[in-house]
């Protein structure tokens, strides 16, 4: 018979008591009532915060958007096909955030900042909230440095400054993405970090943009955030905020950044889909009441920081697609009212061969000449005036049969000026080349040429000036002014090249 030793038992009990951990872990959980169409309704989760991440039993992550009296409306960041009614959900206690670091440069990521280019993981030790507050009034300073796009029509007449928000608006297939990608290409060597956010686009279109950037060496300073048309609405809605967080990381490190949202119409549609499925009351065009806030809180994050914060900047170029040129629709009017100006691309101009198809008459920059170097101001003023007069005369000339000589000359000059604004895609020009081009046109040097010869002459003149008069470029880049010396060099080059060009054409 085994004897029971009381002291042994008491020792074991004491040891167990000493090892007992009284830590109580409270987990905020709930149960799935209903799931479908990228939305789940959860019973429970009493302590959940608005915008908090929740985790489902099978691993899917969602965001709590609707906090109602008897249930929580959650949008899913995935297809949610494995989520079952009655399965458990737990709150994570975290708001959506992404890792950020220099290692993101040159990579293609999704809305959760996970790489999708097949080049392995991205190392990052820091995190930023996807939705962070925009800089306040004291944290900002007025925009004063130019951000060159490389497009004559924009840099001369609708200038963009670092820290500005300039809307690119137009119908489908009018070259909106081309304007944005040309701007990225033109930042080479300018120490500007670019972020391109593709929302709800075809995967082939995004691949084409990435290929263009890689071929031109622009991916070295660019991050692409892509959520294609087959992505869940939640991720299409989040993608612009992810892009903004990546750009902010560099902005607060005293760097200059450029972010392109292509396009915000698709983000608004994704948000409308989510809101209607969550049974939020629809407003104008079935968009929810807070669709203005959706875009304003995103675009207000673009800023030029004050001297005390290091003068970093984030320039935003949001793109909005119109239907049949209707800029008075809900989303276009909202974004126009938030931004500091808009570049309007016209389908009629595009189809008539004027590319980039910028309608200079109704495009505007509310920063204006503050975002131009002095040399550009000196030559650009005359260009805008002459083009405006030409547009007026051209409309009038359609009805008038006989025009006086002065009017005919002005129409001829206008046609040549319109010709010099045309540029091939992915061929941005330096400021010096733009100044030379505008000066040549506004001072009548192109009047003696046929309209069809203008572009050929200008291409040859740029090459001639670069090889034979390099001082011209040096003067403008060092002084930022169109000095008398620079003007004399340019006049000389134009006259010499004109003689050569006429001889070539006659031969």
Curated annotation (Swiss-Prot):
Annotated Pfam families: ATP-synt_ab (PF00006), ATP-synt_ab_C (PF00306), ATP-synt_ab_N (PF02874)
InterPro entries in alphabetical order: ATP_synth_asu-like_sf, ATP_synth_asu_C, ATP_synth_asu_C_sf, ATP_synth_F1_a_nt-bd_dom, ATP_synth_F1_asu, ATPase_a/bsu_AS, ATPase_F1/V1/A1_a/bsu_N, ATPase_F1/V1/A1_a/bsu_N_sf
Binding site residues for ATP: 170-177
The keyword Transferase is assigned to this record: no
UniProt site (Required for activity): 363
Reactions catalysed, as given in the entry: ATP + H2O + 4 H(+)(in) = ADP + phosphate + 5 H(+)(out)
Alphabetical list of PROSITE patterns matching this protein: ATPASE_ALPHA_BETA (PS00152)
Coiled coil feature spans: none
Keywords of the record: ATP synthesis, ATP-binding, CF(1), Chloroplast, Hydrogen ion transport, Ion transport, Membrane, Nucleotide-binding, Plastid, Thylakoid, Translocase, Transport
The protein's Enzyme Commission number: 7.1.2.2
Predominant localisation class: plastid
Disulphide bond pairs: none
One annotated GO molecular function: ADP binding
Cited SUPFAM superfamilies: C-terminal domain of alpha and beta subunits of F1 ATP synthase, N-terminal domain of alpha and beta subunits of F1 ATP synthase, P-loop containing nucleoside triphosphate hydrolases
Subcellular location as annotated: Plastid, Chloroplast thylakoid membrane
GO cellular component terms, A-Z: chloroplast thylakoid membrane; proton-transporting ATP synthase complex
Membrane topology: Peripheral membrane protein
Keyword Transferase: no
Assembly with partners or alone: F-type ATPases have 2 components, CF(1) - the catalytic core - and CF(0) - the membrane proton channel. CF(1) has five subunits: alpha(3), beta(3), gamma(1), delta(1), epsilon(1). CF(0) has four main subunits: a, b, b' and c.
Reported function: Produces ATP from ADP in the presence of a proton gradient across the membrane. The alpha chain is a regulatory subunit.
Annotated family: Belongs to the ATPase alpha/beta chains family.
Protein name (database record): ATP synthase subunit alpha, chloroplastic
The organism of origin for this protein: Atropa belladonna (Belladonna)
Underlying gene: atpA
């Amino acid at each position: 018979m085994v004897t029971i030793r009381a002291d042994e038992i008491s020792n074991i009990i004491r040891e167990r008591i000493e090892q007992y951990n009284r830590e109580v872990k409270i987990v905020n959980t709930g149960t799935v009532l209903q799931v479908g169409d990228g939305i789940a309704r959860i019973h429970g989760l009493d302590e959940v915060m608005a915008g908090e991440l929740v985790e489902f039993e099978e691993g899917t992550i969602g965001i709590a958007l609707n906090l109602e009296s008897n249930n929580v409306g959650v949008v899913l960041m995935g297809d949610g096909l494995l989520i079952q009614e009655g399965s458990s959900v737990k709150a994570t206690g975290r708001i959506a955030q992404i890792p950020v670091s220099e290692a993101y440069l040159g990579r293609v990521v999704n809305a959760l900042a996970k790489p999708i280019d097949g080049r392995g993981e991205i190392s990052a030790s820091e995190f930023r909230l996807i939705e962070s507050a925009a800089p306040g009034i004291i944290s900002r300073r007025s925009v004063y440095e130019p951000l060159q796009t490389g497009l004559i029509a924009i840099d001369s007449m609708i200038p963009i400054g670092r820290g500005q928000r300039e809307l690119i608006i137009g119908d489908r297939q009018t070259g909106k993405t081309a304007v944005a990608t040309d701007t990225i290409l033109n930042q080479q060597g300018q120490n500007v970090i670019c972020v391109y956010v593709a929302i709800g686009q075809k995967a082939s279109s995004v691949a084409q943009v990435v290929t263009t950037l890689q071929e031109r060496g622009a991916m070295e300073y660019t991050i692409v955030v892509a959520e294609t048309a087959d992505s869940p609405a939640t991720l299409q809605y989040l993608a612009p905020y992810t892009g903004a967080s990546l750009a902010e990381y560099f902005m607060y490190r005293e760097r200059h950044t450029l972010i392109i949202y292509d396009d915000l119409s698709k983000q608004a549609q994704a948000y409308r889909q989510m809101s209607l499925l969550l049974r939020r009351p629809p407003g104008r065009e079935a968009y929810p009441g807070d669709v203005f806030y959706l875009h304003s809180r995103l675009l207000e994050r673009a800023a030029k920081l004050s001297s005390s914060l290091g003068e970093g900047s984030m320039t935003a170029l949001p793109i909005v697609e119109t239907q049949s040129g209707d800029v008075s629709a809900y989303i276009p009017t909202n974004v126009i009212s938030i931004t500091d100006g808009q570049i309007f691309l016209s389908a009629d101009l595009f189809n008539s061969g004027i590319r980039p198809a910028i309608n200079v008459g109704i495009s505007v920059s509310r920063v204006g000449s503050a975002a131009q170097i002095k040399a550009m101001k000196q030559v650009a003023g005359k260009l805008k005036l002459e083009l405006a007069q030409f547009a007026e005369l051209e409309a009038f000339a359609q009805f008038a049969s006989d025009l006086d000589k002065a009017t005919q000359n002005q129409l001829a000059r206008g046609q040549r000026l319109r010709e010099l604004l045309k540029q091939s895609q992915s061929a941005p020009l330096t400021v010096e080349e733009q100044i030379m081009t505008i000066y040549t046109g506004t001072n009548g040097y192109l009047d003696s040429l046929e309209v069809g010869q203008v572009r050929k002459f200008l291409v040859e003149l740029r090459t001639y000036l670069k090889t034979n008069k390099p001082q011209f470029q040096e003067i403008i880049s060092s002084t930022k002014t169109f000095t008398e010396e620079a003007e004399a060099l340019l006049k000389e080059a134009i006259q010499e090249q004109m003689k050569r060009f006429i001889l070539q054409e006659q031969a």
